Amino acid sequence: MRKIYEVAKAELQTLFYSPIAWLIIIVFIFQVSLLFTSALELRVTQMLLGYRTPMLTQAIFANPSGGLLFEVQNYLYLYIPLLTMGLMSRELSSGSINLLYSSPITNTQIILGKYLSMVVYASLLICIIGIYVGFGCCVIENVEWRWLLTALLGLYLLICTYAAIGLFMSSLTSYQVVAAIGTLVILTALNYVKVMWQDIEFVRDITYWFSISGRSVSFLYGFIGSEDLIYFLIVILLFLCQTLYG
């Protein structure tokens, strides 16, 4: 385990020495702030106009039409390719992968260490969202905090799944740009496959299984479904195994 932590630490240091990690954090904070203020402004306007605003927790955070967590989910896949494109591609292009293989570190430790670095970065993104969720818990009366924690868990699993896919794509090529584009194409397809050919029952069942982001919807509604939880874990393990043995 110590070797895995060392690889993860080195990867995080490399990531934060580059402007990409900081740029993503800045853009992410700006986007989440914009989405949160938009959702909050809408509810405040409704209250000023005399409309009833029941279930503020759902209205601000878990509303499919403008809720913060739903909107964040729709954009998460855009950030991951920039984070994962250099995980293995950088080592392959520079030749440093040979040094890693010649060191007393196994291939499994290298892959798991690099994936662990993405898990840590995913935790950072969730903490950023958690700031706004925490603010909501302070200002909303009788807030459904268990609901919000479940929703954050769903987003966290979604990011970790995206990261596993990105790591696999990065291991296929020594060109970071190619890895980023490939990851973006796959994640885009997996995000929008759920809206394709929905009038055909057989195809609808298939696209349901391929839609990764759709699996986090139950979490955003406050439900932890064993089927969805197992689905995320299987996809993560599948792509990690493909990276290791592919």
Question: Would you name each region that the model predicts?
Answer:
Residues 11, 131-135, 164-168, 188, ...:
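Alpha-helical transmembrane segments of multipass membrane proteins
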Residues 27-31, 117, 183-190:
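Transmembrane alpha-helical core residues of multi-pass small-molecule transporters
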Residues 82-101, 115:
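Transmembrane helix boundary and interhelical loop/hinge segments in multi-pass membrane proteins
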Residues 34-37, 55-74, 113-174, 224:
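Secretory targeting signals
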Residues 38-63, 172, 179-246:
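Terminal transmembrane helical anchor/hairpin motif
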Residues 108-112:
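Alpha-helix N-cap/helix-start motif at helix boundaries, enriched for small hydrophobics
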Residues 1-79, 83-86, 230, 235-246:
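Hydrophobic alpha-helical transmembrane segments
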